Amino acid sequence: MGSEMCIRDSMNIEKLSIKQIKDLMVKECNDELLTAIKNDARKGVQSIYKSYQREMKERQRVANLYTFENGCRANGYKLIAGVDEVGRGPLAGPVVVASVILPENFFIEKINDSKKLSEATREKIYDIIMKNAIAVNRAIIDEKTIDRVNIYQAAMNGMYEAIYGLNPKPDAVLIDAMPLESLDIYHQSIIKGDAKSASIAAASIVAKVERDRMMNEFDKIYPQYGFAKNKGYGTSEHLEALRKYGPCEIHRKSFEPIKSMVMQK
């Protein structure tokens, strides 16, 4: 009560402790209080102000990631799914496609294209998504299917599977780049969508985390290839292991240089 009276009385926050100011920020943050904090020279108070500015900047960044979703809602669509795939480029392992329906304008700190995030941040956001999403689904396309139908078709098939397996069903779908011409749900294909849409970013994170976990398990079975580190991508160490040991069961036999290795046998 005393603190509130003091704040109301000409914003005399210099009489308040750092803890009291933090508590007040939670209870009644307003322009007058922010101005008083900005003008308080104490280092601790300035730290509070800078932290608040960072949080507001992050909240605005995340809010901007819902531009496509809110555009869909303005046209009457309620359940908007984001879809993305991970693993088209590696020489080994599956393609993983994920689809995610997030609550409307749900704030997830640091959400972004999974490639721009550290492993620890991806894991943290993954847990938030799995706990709070309206729906999550994923499709895993193994290396044998990739070799049989080609990587582009495999990824496309995975997207259809991930979308149609959602429960509840989406009203609209936001897709990272790939056109899905046969999809009978309203959809938009967005170039670099995982950096422009929160729903697509969430899907990219789910797909990335789950594929990385799979490659970590494959590393235990085939330790010579370093899958836990390279995730199946063609690093110099991985290529050297291929030359030394040849391909293993999860290598994509239709990808070079593995295709040539198999043909030479």
Where would I find each of the regions flagged by the language model?
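Short, small-residue-biased leader/transition segments that mark boundaries at the very start
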Residues: 1-7
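RNase H-like, Mg2+-dependent phosphodiesterase core
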Residues: 8-81, 88-265
